[in-house]
Amino acid sequence: MNPVSYINDEQQGDLLLFVYVQPKASRDQIVGLYGNELKIAITAPPIDGKANAYLSKYLAKACKVAKSQVHIIKGEQGRHKQIRISQPQVIPPEIAALLSPFSL
């Protein structure tokens, strides 16, 4: 298994992320690997969907896309999520460093 399989650059230009979210962190950041997922720490609390909305906003800003282009495919109620970012204008350096050279 490819050790960076948690991030896939889709053929249509979308980015699919397998993410572990840490809500109520001291600061927002892409932490790195967490098992076979990308760990992202966010300051928002996991109450009433605030963490999901904040995560979408954070990733949209990082990838320079509209919030409507960030979709939580799986994991709305948990910390383990699949997120699709449609046509990212920028891939954050923390994510680009983990991308497999075969998926670009």
Curated annotation (Swiss-Prot):
| Entry's Gene Ontology cellular component terms | cytoplasm
- Check the record and name the InterPro entries matching this protein: DUF167, YggU-like_sf
One Pfam family, short name: DUF167
The similarity comment for this entry is:
Belongs to the UPF0235 family.
Matching NCBIfam families, A to Z? DUF167 family protein, PRK05090.1
Q: Can you name this protein?
A: UPF0235 protein Sfri_2863
Q: Which organism is it from?
A: Shewanella frigidimarina (strain NCIMB 400)
